[in-house]
Amino acid sequence: MPEIYHYLQQLVNGLTVGSTYALIAIGYTMVYGIIGMINFAHGEVYMIGSYIAFIAITLLAMMGLDSVPLMMLAAFAASIIVTSAFGYSIERVAYRPLRGGNRLIPLISAIGMSIFLQNAVMLSQDSKEKAIPTLLPGNFVFGESSMNGVVISYMQILIFVVTFLVMFGLTLFISRSRLGRACRACAEDLKMTNLLGINSNNIIALTFVIGAALAAVAAVLLGMQYGVINPGIGFLAGIKAFTAAVLGGIGSIPGAMLGGLLLGVAEAFGADVFGDQYKDVVAFGLLILVLLFRPTGILGRPEVEKV
């Protein structure tokens, strides 16, 4: 019985991290699904979101407004607003002027934007780690004790609930709303949507904004879960989320969700079996294994290019 608790604990830990990977991965997959390009500055948008949350919580604490609901609301609201503005700006500056040229040019532009944002944060906030309060300490224990049961922290429960609500809301938006249908139309045939009178530039900008907002939600949740942030967290989080998007099928929103969860679980069990230093090896090994047998990802669809 203790063995079952141990594996269930790893599953819970993996799903916690994986759900946040999924939120970030959706930003990659939505942009790729419409313009066929990867936003390599997306990880830095996530990093900026965590710093905005830190600043919001710190300012409220300095003013004596230390109510947990107020701090959480301020952290989410400020982070989403600021990162959405960054997402829109990245599309306007790094992608839109270069979209009609060689596909490598926007890629290089995005990498340059990523380096610029990371160094801008280093200069403004310094490179030292900063602590974000958890705000929701404590946990539930399912079983006889914490040593012989499954421990789920309040923060993990918050991560599950918020992630589920955000993904459910996004699914409804994409499937039911007029803008969501326009996003799907652009993903199917960008040129045809322009002929039908849909402003594809606005839809593309909207996907960058949505992706940035989802990254902000993940940034606040993971920041409070781990309690520490630094200017370098965006790089690894971005690579992991991109891996999740490719694993599930880049361009597929359900694929990004599934890929994030699978990647998180693979990391958790990989760290448990081989040691924490090998969790990245297991995660990327899983990606290679899936791509060997299904190059389009688990839920990806093969694309036929007309010549």
Curated annotation (Swiss-Prot):
InterPro entries in alphabetical order: ABC_transp_permease, BCAA_transport_permease
Cellular component GO terms, alphabetical: plasma membrane
GO molecular function: L-isoleucine transmembrane transporter activity; L-leucine transmembrane transporter activity; L-phenylalanine transmembrane transporter activity; L-valine transmembrane transporter activity
Compartments in which it is found: Cell inner membrane
Coiled-coil intervals: none
Role, per record: Component of the high affinity leucine, isoleucine, valine, transport system (LIV-I), which is operative without Na(+) and is specific for alanine and threonine, in addition to branched-chain amino acids.
Protein's name in the database: High-affinity branched-chain amino acid transport system permease protein BraD
Biological source species: Pseudomonas aeruginosa (strain ATCC 15692 / DSM 22644 / CIP 104116 / JCM 14847 / LMG 12228 / 1C / PRS 101 / PAO1)
Phylogenetic placement of the source organism: Bacteria, Pseudomonadati, Pseudomonadota, Gammaproteobacteria, Pseudomonadales
